[in-house]
From Swiss-Prot:
Belongs to the adenylate kinase family. It comes from Nitratidesulfovibrio vulgaris (strain ATCC 29579 / DSM 644 / CCUG 34227 / NCIMB 8303 / VKM B-1760 / Hildenborough) (Desulfovibrio vulgaris). It is found in: Cytoplasm. CDD domains: ADK. Residues 125-164 are annotated as: LID. This is Adenylate kinase. Consists of three domains, a large central CORE domain and two small peripheral domains, NMPbind and LID, which undergo movements during catalysis. The LID domain closes over the site of phosphoryl transfer upon ATP binding. Assembling and dissambling the active center during each catalytic cycle provides an effective means to prevent ATP hydrolysis. Disulfide bonds: none annotated. Signal peptide: none annotated. It is an enzyme of class 2 (transferase). One of its GO terms (molecular function) is ATP binding. The lineage of its organism: Bacteria, Pseudomonadati, Thermodesulfobacteriota, Desulfovibrionia, Desulfovibrionales. InterPro entries: Adenylat/UMP-CMP_kin, Adenylat_kinase_CS, P-loop_NTPase. The gene is adk. Monomer. Pathway: Purine metabolism; AMP biosynthesis via salvage pathway; AMP from ADP: step 1/1.
Length: 223
């Protein structure tokens, strides 16, 4: 089973992706990790990408797409879930073409829907536990709201990451994601159009629900 997953920062995309990975024993591949592995490993593609990054330039698609494809082939023998790529419609088309050329199926595309303001509040509401960063605490989500100023799980001291409180940075990331013309949603909608033609399957999930409820709805649509 091969899956693409889309969702804005704050939508719970990472959480749902991890649950799907565990359920179906998929390789959970995140776009940033692809760059780090190729550059850190000194691959030819990694060297080319590094040269662009060091100049402060975007890495061209003719380098990025082969890097992504190579990782999917090497790590995704039992299936994969790709998170964080593609980020625009051009990349979506190129990735689709590359998958077709390799004879690789794209079984499902998942989009987690969440209003922009809700996504922003969720990011700004995240709190980190001093004892364990994996303890979920968010002042804007009732199910995981902390007990006052302490962790709901262990009572540990809480803090907020500085970048989670930077509304300007959050806004820039969301400007890219919610752009339906040449942003990430444009990429998602490219696959939605393919699904309408029966070429893949497109799953839309309401991201405002509880984690378990979203998971149950998602797993019910995967087969």
């Amino acid at each position: 089973m091969n899956i693409l997953i889309f969702g804005p920062n704050g939508s719970g995309k990472g959480t749902q992706g991890a649950l799907v990975k565990k359920k179906y024993d998929l390789a959970h591949i995140e776009s940033g990790a692809i760059f780090r592995e190729h550059i850190g490993g000194g691959t030819e593609l990694g060297k080319q990408a590094k040269a662009f990054i060091e100049r402060g330039d975007l890495v061209p698609d003719d380098i990025t797409i082969p890097m992504v494809l190579e990782t999917l082939k090497s790590k995704g023998a039992n299936g994969w879930l790709l998170d964080g790529f593609p980020r625009n419609m051009v990349q979506a088309q190129k990735l689709w073409d590359a998958l077709q050329a390799e004879g690789m199926k794209l079984d499902y595309v998942i989009e987690i829907l969440l209003p922009r303001e809700v996504a922003k509040n969720r990011i700004m509401g995240r709190r980190l536990c001093k004892n364990d960063n994996n303890h979920p605490n968010n002042i804007f989500i009732d199910a995981i709201k902390p007990n006052g100023d302490v962790c709901r799980v262990c009572g540990g001291e809480l803090s907020a990451r500085s970048d989670d409180q930077d509304e300007g940075a959050i806004g820039k990331r969301h400007d890219i994601y919610y752009n339906t013309v040449d942003g990430t949603l444009a990429a998602a909608y490219f696959y939605k159009d393919l699904a309408a033609k029966g070429m893949t399957k497109y799953i839309e999930l309401d991201g405002e629900g509880a984690i378990d409820a979203i998971k149950d709805k998602l797993l019910a649509q995967l087969s």
